[in-house]
C-alpha cells in the first residue's frame, strides 16, 4: 500500500493475541483491541466474584494490557477499545450480565489502565447486532464518560447486519439514531456483501448527520440538567401513563398495547381493505384501533 502511494491510515483489528497487537503497532496507525478477549477467556464459566477476587482480576488485566499501551504511546499510535456485545468476557458476564452496562464497564476498565500510563489517543466502540442494545450501550457510554470527565471519540457500527435492504435498514436504525443524538465520530456499515457496497450507505448517513448538525446549534450535554425530563435515555423502559377509555372496547395508555390510529375514507366495516391499503399486506387487526376520519374528528372535538 505504501509503495502504491496510499497514505490512508490503517487499522489492525486484533482478537485473542496480544503478541499480534504488539507487532501490528509497528506497522499501522491504529490498533483495535477487543476487551472481551484480549486478556480474558470466554469459557462460559459461571463464577461468583467477590470484590477482592474482582480486584485481583483487574490487576491481572493491568499487567496484560500495559505492554500494548506503552508500545502505542512510544510509537504515536492510536487505539480503538472496541467492545462487542457478542464477546463479553466471562468475568464481565458474571458481574454485569449480557447487558449494555457490561459492554460499557468492559471498555472503561481498559480506558482506566491506559490513562494510568498517561495514554489518551483512544476511541471507543460499543457494537452489537441488535440496534436496540447498540444504541443503549453508546448512550450509556457517553453518560459514563461525561461523569468521569472523559471525552473520547466514538466509532459507530452495527455488527452482523447481514445483506440487502434489511441490513441497510438495521444499520440506519442504529447508526442514524446515534448520529441524530449528536453521537459519533467515525462510522462503519457492516454488510455481508462486497465491502464497496458499504461505502454509499455510510456516506449517505454521514451526509444526513452533517446537514442536521449544521442546521442546529451545538448542544452542551452537561448544560441545564434541571430541564431534563423523567425518561432515562440509557435504558428501554416504557413511559408510565394513565389509562384512557375511548369507549367500552378501546383503551389507551397504561399497560395497553399501543394502538394504530389512521385516517381512511372506507366504511369502518371494511377494516380488512383499510389495513391492506395502508400496510400493503394482510394484518391481524386485533390490536389496532380503527375508525373513520369522521369518527376521529368527533372524538378530537
Task: Give residue ranges: language-model regions.
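Alpha/beta enzyme core
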Residues: 3-8, 16-79, 83-122, 129-147, ...
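Structural preference for beta-strand elements that scaffold enzyme active sites
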Residues: 7-11, 30-32, 76-80, 121-125, ...
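Active-site beta-loop-alpha junctions enriched in small/polar residues
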Residues: 15-17, 36-38, 82-88, 127-131, ...
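Catalytic alpha/beta core domains of metabolic enzymes, predominantly
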Residues: 52-61, 93-232, 238
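N-terminal amphipathic alpha-helix/helix-capping segment at the start of soluble metabolic enzymes
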Residues: 223-269
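Small-residue-rich
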Residues: 253, 262-269, 274-287
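Conserved small/polar residues in nucleotide/adenosyl-binding loops
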Residues: 291-298
Amino acid at each position: 500500500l505504501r509503495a502504491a502511494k496510499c497514505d490512508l491510515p490503517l487499522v489492525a483489528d486484533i482478537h485473542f493475541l496480544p503478541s499480534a497487537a504488539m507487532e501490528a503497532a509497528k506497522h499501522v496507525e491504529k490498533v483495535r483491541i477487543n476487551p472481551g478477549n484480549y486478556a480474558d477467556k470466554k469459557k462460559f464459566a459461571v463464577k461468583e466474584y467477590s470484590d477482592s477476587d474482582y480486584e485481583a482480576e483487574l490487576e491481572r488485566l493491568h499487567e496484560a494490557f500495559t505492554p500494548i499501551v506503552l508500545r502505542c504511546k512510544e510509537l504515536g499510535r492510536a487505539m480503538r477499545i472496541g467492545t462487542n456485545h457478542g464477546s463479553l468476557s466471562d468475568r464481565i458476564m458474571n458481574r454485569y450480565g449480557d447487558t449494555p452496562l457490561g459492554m460499557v464497564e468492559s471498555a472503561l476498565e481498559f480506558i482506566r489502565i491506559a490513562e494510568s500510563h498517561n495514554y489518551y489517543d483512544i476511541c471507543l466502540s460499543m457494537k452489537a447486532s441488535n440496534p436496540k442494545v447498540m444504541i443503549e450501550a453508546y448512550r450509556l457510554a457517553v453518560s459514563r464518560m461525561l461523569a468521569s470527565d472523559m471525552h473520547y471519540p466514538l466509532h459507530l457500527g452495527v455488527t452482523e447486519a447481514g445483506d440487502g435492504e434489511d441490513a441497510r435498514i438495521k444499520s440506519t436504525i442504529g447508526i442514524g439514531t446515534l448520529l441524530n443524538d449528536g453521537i459519533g465520530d467515525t462510522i462503519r456499515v457492516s454488510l455481508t456483501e462486497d465491502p464497496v457496497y458499504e461505502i454509499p450507505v455510510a456516506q449517505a448517513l454521514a451526509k444526513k448527520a452533517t446537514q442536521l448538525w449544521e442546521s442546529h446549534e451545538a448542544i452542551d450535554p452537561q448544560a441545564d440538567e434541571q430541564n431534563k425530563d423523567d425518561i432515562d435515555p440509557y435504558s428501554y423502559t416504557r413511559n408510565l401513563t394513565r389509562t384512557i377509555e375511548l369507549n367500552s372496547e378501546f383503551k389507551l395508555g397504561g399497560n395497553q398495547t399501543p394502538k394504530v390510529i389512521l385516517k381512511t375514507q372506507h366504511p369502518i366495516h371494511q377494516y380488512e381493505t383499510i389495513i391492506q391499503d395502508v400496510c400493503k399486506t394482510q394484518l391481524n387487526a386485533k390490536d389496532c384501533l380503527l375508525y373513520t376520519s369522521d369518527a376521529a374528528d368527533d372524538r378530537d372535538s
